[in-house]
Regions:
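Residues within mature, well-folded domains
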Residues: 175-176, 212-216, 237-491, 498-514
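Structural marker of alpha-solenoid helical repeat scaffolds
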Residues: 62, 106, 157, 194-195, ...
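Intrinsically disordered, low-complexity terminal regions enriched in Ser/Thr/Pro/Gly
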Residues: 426-751
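Residue-level recognition of tetratricopeptide repeat
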Residues: 66, 110, 161, 198-199, ...
Length: 751
């Protein structure tokens, strides 16, 4: 058989000086082992490696106590295992373990024997039988624990043995149960007093382990030490960013994106692992194919769109993701990677790292409410409630074969066995058997425990025999809907403190030569304010933030401002503090969200859709209707020098005229157009009103000659003859060539 040049070179040092027992491994011996490992790593011909193995075995028979020979045989067997499959690979890994054990018996103070044994234990793995592998983990006999013990011993006999310390740290971080994190940390801290203390891979490993045990300050110090000597170390920048995120440090964002841009392949693996649960497949595919700048653009757009939609500061959602990731890794990691599913477990995440609670937590954070029910004969179970603007989400989890593996199921009834769920349809027959009686008792206990989450559980408890089937179907549909939404979206609602009632108004009006504007107006009742006493009266700080997002998800405007209103007197509970913020926006259709906070609490509006008319061009445009009253002192000066008024409460006394302002664009100078204005009752009520759209309480029609550019129209409406109630103020503009635009504003008339 043809020999590789590398093997010819290897023959030169097959016979070596016999090591002296009890003496530490010399630098020359370590270098010799590393050269041997490097040389066989490039060989892919298993036959050539087996020939070398035969030669080494022959030498070992003549010199059985030569630890160097056994180390070579061990690393050679590992390489043969890598090039083999199935049982043959396992035999090679088993041979490697035997050779390394022999080496440790001959030279227990040499680190390489223990180091190699750690790799052999990892390669051998755990039992293929889930029950057996579970017991191995519980008893600390699993592959990760065995390998961690071996790596720990390599660091114990040589505290400065960098390779062993790095593998010990990596293995401890991978362990899902009985993690040797304390052993790894102690070994790494001992290494800080050795000549290897400043080895980059050692500092990186320690930074990770310090963070994993919660020592964020120590993690940051160690990683900063590494970065001070090598600021270009991409992995160090990535790990420092993760630590800084958990500390709430604003520097984390730049570090994280900077490391992502650098494009180091080892760091990219970490980035992808961190992001793959949330990023859609389409973005992941682009991520994999992109260069550094494009990767940053893709990921930044993903996270910032979430910041803007939920009204957080830019970068906040990314930091929250890493806080969630840290929590999930601590609390919801799977003990076993092997997962089998029952017929009632319809959702299958494809995850082997976290259970289904971890998936939901990563996407939506901590639940608003969490409920468990424990009783003999009932599987471990949890239900999580998330209160959301678009509708509450309830998730049910049950752990059957593995108490650490909670699965997401469609219905609370799926906590029971599949057969028991089917038997619930015949309550009379169930009550006649001990098993049936136990199932009914468990069902009642489960339902009572979930009553705080949703009214349907109280209804299920109160329904008569034979009437539960429809409610059970409805309850299951709620769970199916929650799974469909919860496993494909993510959320982080803005926390604005205690909820307060605030009137807000979003009016796309106020265009000038520089473009269109959105008027964000608010009216806060005095009871929702907490005044600060200042010289000369009282101060009322109000924080207002919001975002304007187009239909493709791109942010066109965002704002976050705090204004302090001063008043000589305290604002009484029945009165309002009013304010306005103009926001520059382009023409188009957008969704808008606004959050408002006072010292007493806050509120977040639902997503509202606005249409901003183009202030220039040939398209006939009509702005939103600015509607107000002099009694509500909220006006601004238009470019024409007139006053336009807003009233966020939308409530008007009959004695106060309604002040209307709107803008018409898209016509040439001198063109005529028709305006029809109606104040009518909204549809609803009697059949006549529903058919014909309600009664018109006030109508006004007039013609206008357009001045070119923007025509600013103001009218004062007398509502003194209107009866109290809700009305719709509608304005319709029609050009001579038949084009027509329409806007509506709701208002309420009171005595």
């Amino acid at each position: 058989m043809r020999q590789f040049p590398t093997l010819i070179a290897l023959q030169v040092f097959l016979v070596c000086a016999r090591p002296v027992p009890g003496i530490g491994q010399s630098p020359a011996q370590r270098a010799e082992i590393e050269r041997f490992r490097d040389s066989i790593a490039v060989i892919t011909d298993a036959g050539a490696l087996r020939n070398l193995e035969t030669d080494l075995i022959a030498q070992a028979r003549q010199d059985r106590s030569n630890a160097m020979l056994h180390l070579r045989l061990g690393f050679l067997a590992l390489r043969l295992g890598e090039l083999s499959d199935g049982d043959q690979a396992r035999r090679h890994f088993d041979d490697a373990g035997s050779e390394f054990e022999w080496a440790t018996q001959e030279q227990p103070n040499w680190p390489y024997g223990w180091y190699g044994l750690g790799f052999a234990e990892l390669a051998l793995g755990d039992s293929e039988i889930p029950l057996v592998s579970g017991f191995q983990m519980m008893l600390g006999k699993d592959a990760l624990t065995r390998s961690a013990n071996a790596f720990a011993r390599s660091a114990e006999v040589d505290p400065g043995f960098v390779a062993g310390l790095v593998e010990l740290s990596s293995t401890a971080l991978r362990q899902r149960i009985n993690a040797r994190m304390d052993v790894a940390l102690a070994a790494l801290r001992r290494a800080s007093r050795t000549p290897s203390a400043n080895a980059p891979e050692l500092l990186l490993a320690r930074g990770r382990v310090e963070r994993a045990v919660g020592s964020l300050d120590s993690s940051a110090v160690v990683l900063q030490k590494l970065l001070s000597t090598d600021s270009t170390n991409v992995l160090a920048r990535y790990e420092m960013a993760r630590t800084r995120f958990l500390e709430g440090d604003s520097e984390a964002l730049g570090l994280w994106y900077g490391a992502l841009s650098a494009g180091d392949s080892s760091a990219l693996d970490h980035y992808r692992e961190d992001l793959e649960i949330l990023l859609p497949d389409s973005i992941l595919q682009q991520f994999d194919a992109a260069n550094g700048a494009r990767r940053v653009e893709l990921v930044r757009q993903f996270w910032e769109s979430r910041d803007d939609d939920e009204l957080h500061a830019r970068g906040a959602r990314l930091a929250e993701h890493y806080r969630r990731l840290d929590y999930v890794r601590r609390h919801y990691r799977l003990v076993s990677e092997r997962r089998r599913y029952g017929i009632e477990e319809r959702y299958r995440s494809g995850q082997s790292e976290y259970d289904d609670r971890g998936i939901i937590y990563l996407r939506h954070g901590a639940p608003d409410e969490r409920v468990r029910y424990s009783a003999p004969g009932i599987e471990p179970n949890e239900s999580w409630l998330y209160r959301r603007e678009s509708g509450d989400l309830i998730f049910h989890f049950v752990a059957r074969e593995d108490v650490q593996d909670f699965r997401l199921v469609e219905s609370l009834f799926d906590v029971l066995s599949f057969a028991d769920v089917l038997s619930l349809n015949d309550t009379e027959e169930m009550g006649a058997t001990p098993r049936g009686a136990a199932v009914m008792q468990h069902t009642e206990g489960l339902l009572r425990s979930r009553e705080p989450l949703h009214p349907i559980y109280s209804r299920l408890l109160g329904v008569g025999r034979g009437g539960a089937s429809g409610l059970m179907t409805e309850e299951r549909r709620l769970g199916q809907n929650a799974i469909a939404i919860g496993t494909t979206t993510d959320s982080w609602p803005l926390d604005v403190g205690e909820p307060i009632e605030v009137n807000t108004s979003l009016v796309a009006v106020g265009a000038d030569s520089t473009g269109a504007q959105l008027q964000v107006a608010f009216a806060i009742p005095g009871e929702a304010l907490a005044p600060r006493e200042v010289e000369g009266g009282f101060a009322y700080p109000v924080r207002l933030r919001g975002s304007v997002i187009d239909l493709d998800g791109r942010t066109v405007a965002r704002f976050d401002t705090t204004r302090v209103f001063r008043n000589r007197e305290r604002i009484e509970p029945q009165r309002h503090l009013v304010g306005r913020l103009p926001v520059r926006v382009p023409a188009g259709t957008f969704t808008v969200r606004v959050a408002l906070e006072t010292d007493r609490g806050g509120m977040v509006t639902a997503r509202d859709t606005i249409h901003v008319a183009p202030p220039v061009g040939n398209e006939l445009g009509l702005s939103d209707l600015a509607v107000g009253a002099r009694a509500v002192r909220l006006a601004w000066e238009t470019p024409a020098g007139d006053s336009a008024w807003l009233n966020p409460t939308r409530t008007y006394r009959r004695t106060d005229p309604v002040l209307l302002y709107f803008e018409v664009s898209g016509l040439e100078q001198g063109e005529e157009y028709e305006v029809r204005l109606e104040l009518r009752r909204p549809r609803g009520g009697s059949i006549f009103r529903r058919l014909f759209g309600g009664g018109v309480a006030l109508r006004m029609e007039f013609d206008q000659v357009h001045p070119g550019g923007i025509d600013r129209v103001s009218r004062e409406l007398d509502i003194g003859r209107l009866s109290s109630g809700d009305y719709s103020l509608e304005v319709r503009v029609k050009s001579d060539d038949g084009r027509e635009v329409f806007r509506r504003q709701l208002l309420r008339v009171v005595e």
